[in-house]
């Protein structure tokens, strides 16, 4: 029996006053906006026949009514009523509730004349105070998957429902917060279907962490609901590893002797077991997650049917603990950490798993006494309720529970003992009789017999006594389900002669009184409650009565078992069916009403990489949201009636008594004290870390102990640590770790041997588990209308995995329902798996190793082949198959050699066929690149038909001697008549690729990130002002807003807590960058919806960087030249100060609220002070062009004094350079260090426009902005805009980010000022003579065209293009030439240098550092017994950080190729750079850089690289500066797919802000490396050499030329275009070619090469993959086809291929021999006849 009671307060009233009539007023303690408020009104003790009329309403005491009135009429026969009081938004606004600053309270008022006339009240009103909340309705947010990679797209849905769980169409506000808690996205939306869907992309630079999507009703700030998702770097696993302990706990009792046992299971995502080896290790983990590894417990076991068992005896465990000086009894509160790495045998893939929740406990059970009341009723039974759970969380049945109850009365005490076993669901109840005199009850409860769990509870009697108590006793202690009838019994306790006739009761659920009723009093009164959906997930039952004028009450919280939704949604597939990838699947959707069903399918492999922590939306989450409206606190009951009402979430008034006003929506939290343990179990390395107390110095120590991927002494590393406080611990710990590693031996006898080694926790990020994925992670993201039933046919993706399909329905009649997910396994009993490299080059040799998996019960023999495709050389031409036998339940790799011969994206298809239906085929795209390195060249011409000299142009073709000889290269020509719409429209800044399409630059740092925002804002502003959005596609406006929001989201990743910004995530803040962000985000306020307070904080930070003289300084500059003028000293300070002034001026727009006016005045004062500084410097006349331009613009923009503006203007104009119709600022006057040689504008219209450096463009753009503000659109502004317009690149941008941002801003302002609706035409004719004859194009354009506003044409690279121009509109013609070159002889390499070397896995000398001799990448066999040198924990787990995968065990000559990259950079001391430089390294084919190595270069205290990016085969390394001395960094790379005859690759080092300053080089694979050897089989090699020349050796064999085969070759087939007799002078290597320089000894024939004569030199090229070698000093007869390239002197050079005749000329001595005399004669006859007569056909 469960006794629930209520106690009335005792008041000293006369008996007559106790029975006076009353009006009782009940209501939920919180009023929710827009939700009807339930109000209970009761008439008590009124005389028979008396009728009471009145009304109830809500009001704000300071203003007036907040709701309409609701009337009531009561009498003794009808003495209670439950009303619904509307709370409209308009009334709440009008009564001023939203303006209340403190907790907004509202009064519920009952008004009736009866109160004053009959109830003797002073007024006609009676009321109670309620808390007002803008929370209303229910919102649910769903994402398409629980975890994402940086750079991935997040798709989400928001479901909006009202208080009754019915669809709501009210406006929603949706926000996204990043892992730093910063809002990065906000939008207001209207969802007519009540389901809003959207998506966004996580910035690729995002740090790991938890993001949040929140949604609320726009008018309800407190209706906020959110969902979280994880962002971390991962790739989907091929198989999942699970760790399952035999017992979910480890007992710390010393006498406990059982073994610690653990099962390891590895299964592919499609359910089949994995073959392989499991490597396991253990650690102790504390409450903060810090791990200390236990040496000696490491194991290496073989998987059998995907499983293995690990057992650790108690003695083994205690021995391991002894090494860290601790005892097993000290471990309670800690956890045993287990980590396992499984390497599968067939493919060598490695997956990992960890177990972090294996606690050390003193008992196998836990005790929960939360359902026991905290109030004692003397004289009544006390019900103790306990729930016993096992440590796994499941209920523990049939467990003995003992209770020792001590009853205290003053100094007397009595002890009662009880014992009982738990029932089937772990529950047990004890009824303890409490005598009337007892004041305190102390309970000691224990569960379990051998090692029991213990809990204590003390309850006390109420401080005062009343007339009696009310007991509520449920008939069944179990929680009811929806549809059940819940029966309760009511009875009085301590009232000998009750005088009341009825019990009154209420049912409260989801913050509303759902029912109010009464029941006649009997000796035992039973009440039945039908539990429907409105009472789920919980409700309070509150009962009360009045006795002697005092209320007696009690309450009980009833939890409803979570079950089904109100409606119905079922997802059905044929679960028994075995689906294959690509199959169609029937998905049945069933509802019980018309509904919208939102679907989604998730790859269950996501849960294996950490997605379990963020579970998908299910009914338990729905119930949780619904239950959040529950206003009650605790299981029910209270010390008195008022407390009973209050804890049930009710407000109550009876005229004399009043419940306390609720201050907030939460319940008071019980304070819990947690006992922390500090056990000294650290190994040597932990002791070293323990020497440092602060987190910063510990981080420095850990960084020092981390091994770099390159050789550096500890002293060299410490010298790079910028902070002195960090340098000492870094150096000390580095030397400590170096000594530990030096003492390691390479021949451990077993994996479990103890090692004095570096603790792995500082080497390993356990979440950094990178594996591969080729397939979508989710699909089926769609919303389907369903009317009770719908059958969908969907096609399954190619993944072999298990899909989990989710469904959420939304119905107008039944609300929201979440279906139970259904799983679909996609599997092939026989399938193959194929890996390809990112890209390869032509004629490199590739080894494919598809892996065949056979899960059938019998062996399978299949034939495997690669399908023939043009551009690939294959075994047998692709028709030759390998017969392979794959045993049952196993896997086997098959090797194929392939040589690509065409540069293209080729579909490579591998087919395996067996008998009957057995077989599989996989097709993937192989990206094949041309040899050499890409070279780009751009040319711009101004088209002006009104200028006679510009009506006809002749554009010469390219004749670069370095172009590869057989590349099919072209010149692309683009013509436009509308510069504004081309640059800022849907083909430029607002193109699908966004501003990224304007520039060919990376976007890694914060300043580069702003390129997403600034030009897009400029474009939007231009189109708004000129009203030209209608000329662009309709979706362009939305796309522009999306681009701006993406840029805003990305830049927030760099924000610091104080509002400032740094160039990198872990870099100190920069004044210049912070000002740049403030300017742009201030302009973007309308689109991004950012809070002004954040930008005000940013402006405040900038004020702190101002010096006394008014200038600004930058503690951590981003760039030193590109934006700050390329200047030193004063100029640099002036440019920075002007830049900050411009930003602060734009930032004034965010100071609109009253609270910010004081800071706004400080900003205005700062601008005035800075302007004085700028005016001083401008007056001195010593500034360079850039500083002058930005100063003039800043002073004009901020409306400084006229004198200052005039001085700056005159100074600037004195530096202007004018040529014809062009005006620009180039060389910087005033500082000799800053003079740049002048680049003139074109002398006449027929010449190309010279391309100026980035600094000139930016300076001129500031000049244009200044002129437009000062003079408007005038002649000078026209000339400046003309020059700037023709500096644009082929893509539409300029040189780098800053010049592009400022120039687009300036040109946009100019184009707005000069916008006209007048239409002008431009007619352009382009003609050229190419290989295929004469080609001509006529273009008719106008200045308002959008669709086809430009034409892009293609011409042969070497062809001359003739241009004729007509019409009356100006235009621009741009040419882009892109081709691959043999060599990169760049003159800038004299000033800027880069060198890349690749070696095999380096064994550094002892002098450098013994640490780096150790090879951490020993392979693992699939059977532990085969290891003579087993893999150690340090080898396995530290080595894992340096690789993405492990290959299967192979023979020694088949081990995967690992190489070490060393990148060295330096510069000439006289070369000035902006500071930031980027090294762009194209990796050798088939290689991938080790990400862990790159992260070490950027993330440790001795940072070597600011940032890195990987893009396909490219690795980009960002350097803050280029040193004047040679500095090198290194990283490892793995060749995941074998490639032979690897060709050289390119590397470029360039100044980011002036990309023309660069150095480009080739580098090659290690010499004598297998990377340079052939992999192909005989017929594949023969195919690959089919295009190679063949040297004729007929003369040596004495074969006579009876058939005239030389003449046939020369004149018939293939009919050559040249014939020379040459002497070879030398051989040289050029990229993927060999070059032979020769001297002509006889000219036999020529076609194009008219200058050919004896004694001239000619170059012959042959592919390096061909076997042909021409020996220096020997003579050869060479005949073939004319080349398309020329050498440096302009002479033709020739490619030697299969259409070339190459024959070594015999020596005179050889021809004198009798055997060769006839053959020599025939050769001489041919030479004479061919040279004199040529071909007679």
UniProtKB/Swiss-Prot annotation:
PROSITE patterns: ALPHA_2_MACROGLOBULIN, ANAPHYLATOXIN_1, ANAPHYLATOXIN_2, NTR. One of its GO terms (molecular function) is complement component C1q complex binding. It is found in: Secreted. The modification Sulfotyrosine is found at residues 1412, 1414, 1416, 1676. GO terms for cellular component: axon; dendrite; extracellular region; extracellular space; neuronal cell body; synapse. Its main location: secreted. Disulfide bonds join 66-95, 633-667, 700-726, 701-733, 714-734, 1464-1528, 1576-1581, 1588-1666, 1611-1735, 1711-1720. Residues 674-677, 1443-1446 form a propeptide. Pfam families: A2M, A2M_BRD, A2M_recep, ANATO, C4_MG1, CO4A-B_CUB_C, MG2, MG3. Prior to secretion, the single-chain precursor is enzymatically cleaved by plasminogen (PLG) to yield non-identical chains alpha, beta and gamma. During activation of the complement systems, the alpha chain is cleaved into C4a and C4b by different proteases depending on the complement pathway: C4b stays linked to the beta and gamma chains, while C4a is released in the plasma. The alpha chain is cleaved by C1S to generate C4a and C4b following activation by the classical complement system. N- and O-glycosylated. O-glycosylated with a core 1 or possibly core 8 glycan. There is a cross-link at residues 1005-1008 (Isoglutamyl cysteine thioester (Cys-Gln)). One of its GO terms (biological process) is inflammatory response. Induction: Induced in hepatic stellate cells by iron overload and by gamma-interferon. The keyword Secreted applies. Residues 1-19 form the signal peptide. Keywords: Cleavage on pair of basic residues, Complement pathway, Disulfide bond, Glycoprotein, Immunity, Inflammatory response, Innate immunity, Phosphoprotein, Secreted, Signal, Sulfation, Thioester bond. Transmembrane segments: none annotated. Residues 700-734 form the Anaphylatoxin-like domain. In absence of complement activation, circulates in blood as a disulfide-linked trimer of an alpha, beta and gamma chain. C4 is a major histocompatibility complex class-III protein. This is Complement C4. It comes from Rattus norvegicus (Rat).
């Amino acid at each position: 029996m469960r006794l629930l009671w209520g106690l009335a307060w005792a008041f000293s009233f006369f008996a007559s006053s106790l029975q006076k009539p009353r009006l009782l007023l009940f209501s939920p303690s919180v009023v929710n906006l827009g939700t009807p408020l339930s109000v209970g009104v009761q008439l008590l003790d009124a005389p028979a026949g008396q009728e009471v009329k009145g009304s109830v309403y809500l009001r704000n005491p300071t203003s007036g009514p907040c709701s309409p009135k609701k009337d009531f009429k009561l009498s003794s026969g009808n003495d209670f009523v439950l009303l619904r009081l509307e709370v409209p938004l308009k009334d709440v606004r009008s009564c001023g509730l939203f303006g209340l600053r403190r907790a907004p309270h509202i009064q519920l008022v009952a008004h009736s004349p009866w109160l004053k006339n009959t109830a003797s009240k002073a007024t006609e009103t009676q009321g109670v105070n309620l808390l007002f909340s803008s929370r209303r309705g229910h919102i649910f947010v769903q994402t398409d998957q629980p975890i994402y990679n940086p750079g991935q797209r997040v798709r989400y849905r928001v479901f909006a429902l009202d208080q009754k769980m019915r669809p709501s169409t009210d406006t929603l506000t949706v926000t996204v917060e990043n892992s730093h808690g910063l809002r990065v996205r906000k939008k207001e939306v209207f969802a007519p279907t009540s389901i809003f869907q959207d998506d966004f992309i996580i910035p690729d630079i995002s740090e790991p962490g938890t993001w949040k999507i929140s949604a609320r009703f726009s008018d309800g700030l407190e209706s906020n609901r959110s969902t979280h998702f994880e962002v971390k770097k991962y790739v989907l696993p091929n198989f999942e590893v699970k760790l399952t302990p035999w017992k979910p706990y480890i007992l710390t009792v010393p006498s406990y002797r059982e073994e610690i046992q653990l099962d390891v299971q590895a299964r592919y995502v499609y359910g089949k077991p994995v073959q392989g080896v499991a490597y396991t290790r253990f650690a102790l983990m504390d409450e903060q997650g810090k791990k200390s590894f236990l040496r000696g417990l490491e194991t290496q076991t073989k998987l059998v049917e995907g499983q293995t068992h690990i057992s650790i005896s108690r003695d083994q465990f205690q021995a391991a603990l002894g090494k860290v000086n601790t005892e097993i009894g000290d471990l309670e509160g800690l956890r045993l950490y287990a980590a396992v790495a499984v390497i599968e045998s067939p493919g060598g893939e490695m997956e990992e798993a960890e177990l972090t929740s294996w606690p050390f406990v003193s008992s196998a059970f836990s005790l929960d006494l939360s359902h026991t009341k905290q109030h004692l009723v003397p004289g009544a039974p006390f019900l103790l309720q306990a729930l016993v759970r096992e440590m796994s969380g499941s209920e523990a049945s049939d467990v003995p529970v003992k209770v020792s109850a001590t009853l205290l009365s003053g100094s007397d005490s009595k002890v009662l003992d009880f014992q009982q076993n738990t029932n089937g669901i772990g529950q047990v109840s004890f009824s303890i009789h409490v005598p009337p005199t007892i004041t305190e009850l102390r309970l000691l409860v224990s569960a379990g017999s051998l090692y029991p769990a213990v809990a204590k509870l003390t309850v006390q009697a109420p401080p005062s006594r009343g007339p009696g108590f009310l007991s509520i006793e449920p008939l069944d202690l179990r929680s009811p389900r929806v549809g059940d009838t819940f029966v309760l019994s009511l009875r009085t306790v301590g009232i000998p002669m009750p005088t009341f006739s009825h019990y009154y009761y209420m049912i409260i659920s989801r913050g509303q009184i759902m029912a109010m009723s009464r029941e006649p009093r009997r000796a035992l009164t039973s009440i039945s409650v039908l539990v429907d959906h409105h009472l789920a997930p919980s409700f309070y039952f509150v009962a009360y009565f009045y006795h002697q004028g005092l209320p007696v009450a009690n309450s009980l919280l009833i939890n409803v078992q979570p079950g089904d939704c109100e409606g119905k949604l079922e997802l059905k597939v044929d679960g028994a069916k075995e689906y294959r990838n690509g199959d169609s699947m029937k998905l049945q959707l069933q509802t019980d009403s018309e509904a919208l069903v939102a679907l989604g399918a998730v790859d269950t492999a996501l849960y294996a990489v950490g997605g379990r922590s963020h579970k998908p939306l299910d009914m338990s989450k729905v119930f949780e949201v619904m239950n959040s409206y529950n206003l009650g606190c605790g299981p029910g009951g209270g010390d008195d009636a008022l407390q009973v009402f209050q804890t049930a979430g009710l407000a109550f008034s009876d005229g004399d008594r009043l419940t306390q006003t609720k201050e907030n929506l939460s319940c008071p939290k019980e304070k819990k004290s947690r006992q922390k343990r500090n056990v000294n179990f650290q190994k040597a390395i932990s002791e070293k870390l323990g020497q440092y107390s602060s987190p910063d110095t510990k981080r420095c120590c850990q960084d020092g102990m981390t091994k770099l991927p390159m050789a550096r002494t500890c002293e060299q590393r410490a010298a790079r640590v910028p902070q002195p406080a960090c340098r000492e611990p870094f150096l000390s710990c580095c030397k400590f770790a170096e000594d530990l590693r030096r003492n390691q031996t390479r021949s451990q006898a077993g994996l479990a041997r103890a090692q004095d080694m570096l603790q792995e926790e500082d080497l390993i990020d356990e979440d950094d588990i990178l594996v591969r994925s080729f397939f979508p992670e989710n699909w089926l993201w769609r919303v389907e209308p369903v009317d009770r039933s719908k059958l969908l046919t969907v096609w399954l993706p190619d993944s072999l995995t298990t899909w989990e399909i989710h469904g959420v329905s939304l119905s107008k009649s039944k609300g929201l329902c979440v279906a139970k997910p259904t799983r679909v396994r996609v599997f092939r009993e026989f399938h193959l798996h194929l890996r390809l490299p990112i890209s390869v080059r032509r004629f490199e040799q590739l080894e494919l190793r598809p892996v065949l998996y056979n899960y059938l019960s019998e062996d399978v023999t299949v034939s495997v082949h690669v399908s023939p495709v043009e551009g690939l050389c294959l075994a047998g031409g692709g028709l030759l198959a390998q017969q392979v036998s794959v045993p049952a339940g196993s896997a086997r790799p098959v090797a194929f050699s392939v040589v690509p011969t065409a540069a293209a994206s080729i579909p490579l298809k591998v087919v395996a066929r067996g008998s009957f239906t057995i077989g599989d085929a996989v097709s993937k795209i192989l990206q094949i690149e041309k040899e050499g390195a890409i070279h780009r060249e751009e040319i711009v011409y101004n088209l002006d038909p009104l200028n006679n000299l510009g009506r006809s142009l002749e554009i010469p073709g390219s004749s670069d001697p370095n172009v590869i000889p057989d590349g099919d290269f072209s010149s692309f020509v683009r013509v436009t008549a509308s510069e504004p719409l081309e640059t800022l429209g849907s083909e430029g800044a607002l193109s699908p690729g966004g501003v990224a399409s304007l520039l060919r630059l990376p976007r890694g740092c914060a300043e580069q990130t702003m390129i997403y925002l600034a030009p897009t804002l400029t474009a939007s502003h231009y189109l708004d002002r000129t009203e030209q959005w209608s000329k662009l596609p309709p979706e362009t406006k939305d796309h522009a807003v999306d681009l701006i929001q993406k840029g805003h989201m990305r830049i927030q990743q760099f924000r610091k807590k104080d509002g400032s910004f740094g160039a990198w995530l872990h870099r100190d803040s920069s004044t210049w960058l912070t000002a740049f962000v403030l300017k742009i985000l201030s302009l973007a306020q309308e689109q991004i919806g950012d809070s002004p307070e954040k930008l005000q904080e940013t402006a405040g930070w900038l004020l702190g960087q101002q010096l006394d003289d008014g200038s600004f300084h930058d503690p951590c500059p981003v760039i030193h030249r590109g934006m700050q003028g390329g200047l030193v000293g004063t100029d640099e300070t002036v440019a920075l100060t002007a830049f900050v002034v411009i930003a602060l001026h734009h930032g004034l727009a965010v100071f609109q609220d009253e609270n910010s006016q004081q800071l706004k005045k400080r900003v205005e004062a700062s601008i005035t002070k800075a302007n004085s500084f700028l005016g001083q410097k401008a007056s001195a006349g010593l500034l360079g062009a850039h500083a002058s331009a930005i100063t003039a613009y800043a002073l004009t923009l901020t409306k400084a004094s006229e004198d200052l503006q005039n001085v700056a203007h005159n100074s600037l104009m004195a530096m202007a350079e004018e040529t014809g119709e062009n005006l620009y600022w180039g060389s910087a006057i005033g500082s000799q260090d800053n003079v740049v040689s002048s680049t003139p504008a074109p002398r006449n219209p027929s010449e190309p426009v010279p391309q100026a450096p980035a600094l000139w463009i930016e300076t001129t753009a500031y000049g244009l902005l200044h002129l437009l503000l000062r003079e408007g659109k005038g002649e000078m502004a026209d000339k400046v805009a003309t020059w700037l317009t023709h500096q644009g690149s082929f893509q539409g941008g300029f040189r780098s980010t800053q010049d592009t941002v400022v120039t687009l801003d300036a040109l946009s302002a100019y184009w707005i000022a000069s916008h006209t609706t007048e239409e002008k035409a431009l007619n352009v004719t382009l003609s050229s003579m190419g290989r295929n004859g004469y080609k001509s194009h006529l273009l008719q354009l106008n200045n308002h065209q959008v669709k086809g506003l430009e034409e892009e044409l293609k011409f042969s690279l070497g062809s001359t293009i003739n241009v004729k121009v007509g019409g009356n509109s100006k235009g621009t013609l741009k040419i882009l030439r892109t081709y691959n070159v043999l060599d990169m002889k760049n003159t800038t390499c004299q000033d800027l240098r880069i060198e890349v070397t690749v070696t095999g896995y380096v064994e550094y000398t002892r002098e450098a550092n013994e640490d780096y001799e150790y090879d951490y990448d020993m392979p693992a066999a699939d059977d532990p017994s085969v290891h003579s040198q087993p893999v150690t924990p340090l080898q396995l787990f530290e080595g894992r950080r340096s690789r993405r995968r492990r290959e299967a065990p192979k023979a020694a000559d088949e081990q995967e190729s690992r190489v070490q990259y060393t990148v060295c950079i330096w510069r000439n001391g006289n070369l000035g750079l902006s500071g930031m430089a980027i090294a762009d390294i194209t990796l050798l084919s088939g290689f991938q850089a080790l990400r862990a190595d790159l992260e070490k270069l950027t993330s440790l205290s001795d940072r070597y690289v600011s940032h890195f990016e990987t893009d396909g085969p490219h690795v980009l390394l960002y350097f803050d500066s280029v040193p004047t001395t040679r500095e090198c960094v290194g990283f490892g790379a793995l060749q995941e797919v074998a490639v032979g005859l690897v060709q050289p690759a390119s590397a470029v080092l360039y100044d980011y802000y002036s990309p023309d300053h660069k150095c480009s080089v080739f580098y090659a694979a290690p010499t004598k490396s297998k990377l340079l050897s052939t992999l192909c089989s005989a017929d594949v090699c023969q195919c690959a050499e089919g295009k190679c020349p063949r040297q004729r050796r007929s003369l040596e064999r004495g074969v006579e030329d009876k058939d005239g085969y030389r003449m046939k070759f020369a004149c018939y087939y293939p009919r050559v275009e040249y014939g020379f007799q040459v002497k070879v002078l030398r051989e040289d290597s050029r990229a993927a070619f060999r070059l032979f320089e020769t001297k002509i000894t006889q000219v036999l024939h020529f076609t194009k090469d008219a200058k050919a004569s004896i004694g001239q030199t000619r170059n012959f090229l042959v592919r390096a993959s061909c076997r042909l070698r021409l020996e220096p000093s020997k003579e050869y007869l060479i005949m073939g086809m004319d080349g398309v390239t020329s050498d440096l002197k302009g002479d033709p050079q020739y490619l030697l291929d299969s259409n070339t005749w190459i024959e070594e000329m015999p020596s005179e001595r050889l021809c004198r021999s009798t055997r060769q005399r006839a053959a020599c004669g025939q050769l001489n006859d041919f030479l004479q006849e061919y040279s004199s007569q040529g071909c007679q056909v």
